[in-house]
Design a protein with these regions (language model features):
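Short, polar N-cap/turn motifs at the start of nucleic acid-interacting alpha helices
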Residues: 155-159, 247-266
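Active-site/catalytic core of tyrosine-dependent DNA strand-transfer enzymes
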Residues: 179-228, 232-233, 238
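N-terminal DNA-binding recognition helix of tyrosine site-specific recombinases/integrases
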Residues: 35-46, 56-57, 61-99, 143-145
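Catalytic-site neighborhood detector that most strongly recognizes the C-terminal catalytic loop/helix
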Residues: 168-171, 256-281
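Basic, Lys/Arg- and aromatic-enriched nucleic-acid-binding interface segment
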Residues: 70-74, 98-144, 148
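Short, aromatic/basic-rich helix-turn unit that serves as a nucleic-acid recognition element
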Residues: 7-39
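Conserved tyrosine-mediated DNA breakage-rejoining catalytic core shared by Y-recombinases
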Residues: 149-187
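Active-site-proximal segment of tyrosine recombinases
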Residues: 146-147, 229-230, 239, 246-258
């Protein structure tokens, strides 16, 4: 038990020394808190209750304790494989199969809100500041916390409406275009001035809070206003929107602040369908009836 606790300390030190993981310290803290710490805590808890040593068998036991085809299962696999590399422990050859890939499959996509549902839900929010948050997330596909760490000056009259997300966010600085562009007006995002306090007052000093905690505040407000979908559903819906209009995957991934590989894996179903539709349309255009 003691050795695993010590190992977590050394692994954490190594994690934060690897600057390639994130472009910002706040992003690294958020990633550690949400994507590594919970799984290491479970490892420590299970090892404490059992006689298993830190070996392949124990890591497999932890991985299989999460439901198959879930984000938790996938992230647990990523965290434990990083730990295994740290201590030079060989994992079973079928680890990736056990980890079970996570993506938004067709069944999950059916649960995403339609444009009409998004517009109707906007009207349910009585507080204009939280309504503004909702509109930004729907129009720009932002992560929960990114709303509070973005340059909104682009929304002023005459601005280009291209939002810049600040470097101190989870995946660093990136620019985002609105999809749909007309939602900037529909959600009243351009009614801003230098003196207008647009966003809800929450603690955003990252010396006193975390990106994860800020994100939770947004989720809490969605539940409070009885929005029938989650904040991340708005982000996924934005991604699907860009796919269906034909925006290149590389461009959409950059706007979302993640890698192309994550983008294509997460949205595989819709990307495949788009590419097939393009091929079918091209073939049909050459057929003479």
């Amino acid at each position: 038990m003691q050795s695993i606790l010590i190992l977590r300390v050394t692994f954490k030190r190594q994690f934060f020394s690897d600057t390639s993981r994130s472009k910002s310290s706040a992003g690294m803290i958020s990633t550690w808190q949400s994507a590594y710490k919970p799984y290491l805590n479970r490892l420590i808890g299970v090892s404490h209750k059992s006689t298993l040593k830190l070996n392949e068998e124990l890591l497999v036991k932890i991985l299989l304790s999460y439901k198959e085809n879930t984000r938790s299962r996938q992230q647990c696999g990523i965290a434990l494989s990083a730990l295994a590399r740290h201590i030079k422990l060989e994992l079973p050859k079928n680890w990736k199969q056990l980890q079970s890939g996570y993506g938004i499959h067709e069944s999950n996509f059916r649960k995403l809100p339609s444009d009409e549902e998004i517009i109707n839900s906007f009207q349910l929010i009585p507080n204009p500041k939280w309504r503004f948050v909702f509109g930004l997330m729907a129009t720009y596909g932002l992560r929960n916390h990114e709303v509070f760490f973005s340059d909104l000056s682009c929304l002023k009259k005459g601005g280009d409406k291209i939002l810049r997300v600040f470097p101190n966010t989870k995946t660093g600085e990136h620019q985002v275009w609105p999809f749909h562009p007309e939602w900037v007006g529909l959600f009243e995002l351009e009614n801003i001035s230098d003196t207008l306090d647009l966003l809800p007052v929450i603690k955003t000093d990252l010396k006193e809070t975390t990106l994860q905690h800020i994100g939770r505040r947004v989720s809490e407000q969605f539940r409070r206003y009885k929005i029938s979908f989650t904040p991340y559903d708005l982000r996924h819906a934005w991604a699907v929107r860009t796919i269906l209009i034909g925006l290149p995957n590389t461009v959409a991934a950059k706007m979302m602040g993640h890698s192309v590989s994550i983008h294509t894996k997460t949205y595989h179903h819709w990307i495949t369908r788009r590419d097939q539709q393009i091929a079918v349309d091209s073939a049909l255009s050459r057929v003479k009836y």
